């Protein structure tokens, strides 16, 4: 598929999305209203439109990531700051690549796995076995990528982190009350996985965030590998360190709110007694 047709198909899907996925469009709108109460309704609707356009383009572009030659992937991506990760890999220290749910999440993962010889990440199996196989193969196209199930838990990570094999970790999903703690996210008590802080403390691991932005005008994914967090978690409690991650995520989102993956019900799990937002 040509670059031009790729963007055209993404634009068509963004037009179709609100008509066939009204529930998801509602979730996007609700999340933005919750996180930006100061924004006008016109601004919210503009972000909703932008977010849907970016999200649908990222769906289309998975075909490029999973099937196209590597040079085609490089044509639609621009990686900066890789030296921040390379320094950690050179030392052999346990390393967490902190990858929040921005639109370009999959592009960042594919580009990094094409460079880093070996890595691991958590993976939730799909109900449809055919789709599961497609996704598994797509996410492990280049070099060695270990896809760990949530059932493996920390034990599944131990052998890789101790060998200096980096963990590509997504910190910002709501996996329910049993696996989460409540800490602020945009001033809302949010069920948040404490695993980033727990793993960093347990293995004395360095945490280097990766933040992405899709320029819809050019179709280029800009991938920014940031320096390792200083003194993390340090002397902070697990709750304080997890709140720190959420605060950083807020700062990155505020640069361009439409770039975040708002189609997820980020505030699905509520503290006891609170009403459902969705």
Language-model-derived ranges and their functions:
Residues 75-78, 102, 128, 147-150, ...:
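A conditional alpha-helix N-cap/helix-loop micro-motif detector
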Residues 1-99, 134-136:
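Membrane-anchoring hydrophobic helices of lipid-metabolizing enzymes
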Residues 20, 39-49, 87-90, 114, ...:
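Non-catalytic C-terminal accessory region of glycerolipid acyltransferases
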Residues 17, 73, 123-124, 145, ...:
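A generic structural signal for short
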Residues 29, 109, 135-136, 196, ...:
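Generic structural marker for isolated residues within well-ordered, non-membrane alpha-helices
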Residues 91-151, 177-184:
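Catalytic core of membrane glycerolipid acyltransferases/transacylases, capturing the structured
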